[in-house]
């Protein structure tokens, strides 16, 4: 079992070494790629490093140097991997950005991080048209040529002599911005040493990746989860990464899993939920799949049961955050307790603590916290030491999530700190109610929040997306309420249900319960007025 010291990188270290070592193995396949039209391409590790070195040399010729920060906004294309590797091998810093960002988002990042350049896929350049600070940057495109942007891949550069920068484990590698509940996004500083610790933590024990595996992790570049799995865990293990450059369609995903004989699969709970509802699952042969994991939010028991029944695979949960790594998970050899988050990952000191910073007793709900000495914890919030202080309690960094631990050390998720519902003195976690609701065949997805109530303080309110929106009715409301009462404690049932066509979500597909809570507060305030 891994210990903390096993997660500490050598003092002189560059994470690209983890991938580059596989380029010596002849034509070992690094990446398989397909887009919506069916076009296919593949790169070996040797080809990947050739492209990496060419891009790195081109960036050096343009005047970039160690420590410079570059915004990278690229989709699921093979060049994304080479761009990231080139920047990191150069000792520079990647700022991952989603194409969903708007001008104000980009302006903040450019100013706050003192960005020197931007590498952007041609289809996304429009996002920079209204960015007032874009003229300060060296702007480089990938794909079609665009006026005012230099095409990075067309630059003639000799990569044969491109060398790895002299970096240490404490040098910044990534600056990832993550939303806070208030104020501007937080700039999360990850070092090369963090990448080493993350790779050791997640690739083997959780994802269960070996060199011979074909791995599909569905996250897109621009998000920390892409850095976690498709980039670090897959390439750092010498495996073959499958990349699908297309929109999510549940049936299409199942067809690709079947056709490419995927061995390891990692996707969001939302994607699993929608795949589980596809009719005729017996059409798909997923016998090559030996590992399936989910991260982002707890996965419903019913979905886990569907994959077990039809494909003989146990979907295992994992929990982490932008600031850290896989902190808690159902590891490959850990007995599954349905509904549990699993146990803390080896080498990472993760606890549940109370308001005094003391470790909670089994069964006591507290804050999930990471010891500050954990190697896979981020270095700091960039230029924001005060925000860092607000999330430290004693020797621990607070994740913002609450849970309880049982006698065997399994963690059981309760809620985000601000998602907990207190109704008539009862403490209710929204996930339990949501998990019950989605077991009903008419429910596609749902979100549960607190709604202000003069008598009870708050009541449980459910926003429900139906499989068929035309079936909404008062009768169905009563059916769903009774359904929940039969599955979980009756006091937890949703006293109000509202049918909606969609739920508000973050760009990474997490439900924005905070938006729904604010809506409820406003609605109740208007009724009082």
UniProtKB/Swiss-Prot annotation:
The keyword Disulfide bond is assigned to this record: no
Nucleotide-binding keyword on record: yes
Annotated keywords: ATP-binding, Ligase, Nucleotide-binding
InterPro entries: AMP-bd_C (IPR025110), AMP-bd_C_sf (IPR045851), AMP-binding_CS (IPR020845), AMP-dep_synth/lig_dom (IPR000873), ANL_N_sf (IPR042099), Mitochondrial_ACSM (IPR051087)
GO MF term list: ATP binding; CoA-ligase activity; fatty acid ligase activity; fatty-acyl-CoA synthase activity
Gene Ontology annotations of biological process type: acyl-CoA metabolic process; fatty acid biosynthetic process
Residue stretches spanning the membrane: none
EC nos: 6.2.1.-
Protein name: Uncharacterized acyl--CoA ligase YtcI
Provenance organism: Bacillus subtilis (strain 168)
Organism placement in taxonomy: Bacteria, Bacillati, Bacillota, Bacilli, Bacillales
